[in-house]
C-alpha cells in the first residue's frame, strides 16, 4: 500500500500521499528503566480500548469512528468540559517523561482554565521520588521545557515541576526560581530562548548546573552568560561611576559588535527586565543605540596602518560613549 513506518519502535505509519500519521492499536509493557524501557505489542488482538488505557491523560484517550461517534471509555470529554488534566490508569507512572509532559500541558492550557487533578499530581510526586526521572535523556527534558517556554504561561510549567517535586531530581544542589520574573517578562518577550535566559539569570542558582540539568543548547547558555554580565553591570551603576572604557571593554568582551544581532536580542531581555524588575534610575546606558553607533565607526584616515587603525577606532568609540552618557546622564 506504500505506507512507511516512522522509526522502528512504534507502529506508526505515514500515508504515501497525504503523509498523515496512522497508528496501529498498541500496548506497552514495562521492561526496563526510564522513558524507553518498554516492550511494544501491536498484534491484531490488541483492541482500541487496550490502546486508550495506556494513554497518559483522559483528554488524550478519546477516539472517533468513521461516522463521527466518540469512543471515550475514560470520560475524557467530561474532563475537557471540567478543565481537568487527569491520568488514565496506573500505566501513567511507568513513564517518567509524563511528569514533564503534564506540567507542560498545564502551562499550555492554563489560559483555558485547565489544572492538574489531585490524584494525578500525587502520582507525579511518586514518580519524582523514585530514580526514574534521572534516566530521562537531556534532549527530551529540554524539548518539553522549550515547548512550555513557547506558551502563554511558561511559569506554570516550572511551578508544577516544583509542586510535583520533579525539579529536585532534575537539578542537584540548592536553587531558587523567581517565577514572578518569568511571568512578568513573558508578557513582553515571546522567544523561548529569551524567556529561559531571563528566568535563570534572575534565579538563585548556578547557571552551569541548571543549564546542564535541562539539557540547554550551548548557544542559549551563552545568552544566559551575557545577560548576567549586563544585569550585574547595570546594578553596579547605582554604586559606582562607570568609566567610558569599562563600557567599551564590556561590549567587546561580550562580542557585542561582531555578534551584534545576538547582542540586540539580549538587550531586548535587559529592557524587559529593567522595566519589570530592576526599574533602575539614574545613569542610563542606551546599549542598543550605542552598539549600532560603535559598529558604524570607520578609520578616520586611509593612511593609518595595523595597530594605528585599531587605536583610532577605539578612540572614536570612546568619544561616542562619552557623548551618549553625557546626553543620557
Over which residues does each language-model region extend?
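Catalytic cores of the polymerase beta-like nucleotidyltransferase superfamily
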Residues: 1-329
